[in-house]
Amino acid sequence: MTKEHEIINSIQEVSLEELDQIIGAGKNGVFKTISHECHLNTWAFLATCCS
């Protein structure tokens, strides 16, 4: 079996609910991440504080 077939078979094993979560089409169209509820300034400070 080629890699393409393996990839297609792997995708077919994912349920529609799991796919919705992966692509961010869940409840509100938002996939929650660690930075979802944080302000950009907080992350900018953390990224530049030690440079």
Curated annotation (Swiss-Prot):
2,3-didehydrobutyrine: residues carrying this PTM: T48
Keyword Secreted: yes
GO biological process, one term: killing of cells of another organism
Propeptide boundaries: 1-25
Gene Ontology CC annotations of this record: cell surface; extracellular region
Chain positions of cross-link Beta-methyllanthionine (Thr-Cys): T33-C38, T42-C50
Keywords: Antibiotic, Antimicrobial, Bacteriocin, Lantibiotic, Secreted, Thioether bond
Location (main, coarse): secreted
Pfam family, one: L_biotic_typeA
GO molecular function: signaling receptor binding
Function recorded in the entry: Lanthionine-containing peptide antibiotic (lantibiotic) active on certain Gram-positive bacteria. The bactericidal activity of lantibiotics is based on depolarization of energized bacterial cytoplasmic membranes, initiated by the formation of aqueous transmembrane pores.
NCBIfam families: HEC_x9_TCC_lant (NF040664)
Family stated for the protein in its record: Belongs to the type A lantibiotic family.
Protein name: Lantibiotic streptococcin A-M49
